[in-house]
Amino acid sequence: MNITPFPTLSPATIDAINVIGQWLAQDDFSGEVPYQADCVILAGNAVMPTIDAACKIARDQQIPLLISGGIGHSTTFLYSAIAQHPHYNTIRTTGRAEATILADIAHQFWHIPHEKIWIEDQSTNCGENARFSIALLNQAVERVHTAIVVQDPTMQRRTMATFRRMTGDNPDAPRWLSYPGFVPQLGNNADSVIFINQLQGLWPVERYLSLLTGELPRLRDDSDGYGPRGRDFIVHVDFPAEVIHAWQTLKHDAVLIEAMESRSLR
């Protein structure tokens, strides 16, 4: 896939992007995941390091891996990511739900037994990921007390707010722990913006920026956001001052705005 490099941005804008990116990639752990959980929930996405992180936890802790994802508006990004992967490109994708594709990765490449893979293949958005996953957990023979939720880092904070909205004050609900697998960071090279993380299977830079800039309006708790005072999809989310400041930096960067508009990303 030939993608036009994203033009270099000011150091202040790069810093602002990384502040927001780190905040969105909510990580309840420091470094590796040491906490023994009862289940890992992998929400369908197309970020290979995140997918691998969920599989690694399930394999190492020998716990069930619940994979959630049907066929939605972003499924083709997973198809493309699989096709470009040096190992996973042998997996059939076209016309298949995200969960079934990721289950093949978990079993064939991470050697997770079929009985430890729980598939939810009907959800098409973040809300359904949470609702249908919780319904599947409720059918488990043994109660799940703690679940590690793994999602595309740009959607991690919203996904956690969605799970907490779905379970509310239910005392029997699992303890939801957030883990994005890694935290993306951008930087400038000589003539373009690149990921400092040298990892296989990341988004194109322009796709990452589109997702990142689209998340903050959704997380707001106002008439246009997803919070209780808006569409009521998520619990209230507090925005740190540095994130608000970073968002203002992005909104007033003419180079960023022009580059994204030229790519139809706004």
From Swiss-Prot:
Q: Which InterPro entries match?
A: Cell_Envelope_Assoc, DUF218, Rossmann-like_a/b/a_fold
Q: Superkingdom of the source?
A: Bacteria
Q: Per the record, GO CC terms?
A: plasma membrane
Pfam families associated with the record: DUF218
Give the UniProt family note. Answer: To S.coelicolor SCO4629.
Q: What does this protein do?
A: Binds S-adenosyl-L-methionine (AdoMet).
Quaternary form?
Monomer.
Q: Please report the name of this protein according to its UniProt entry.
A: Protein YdcF
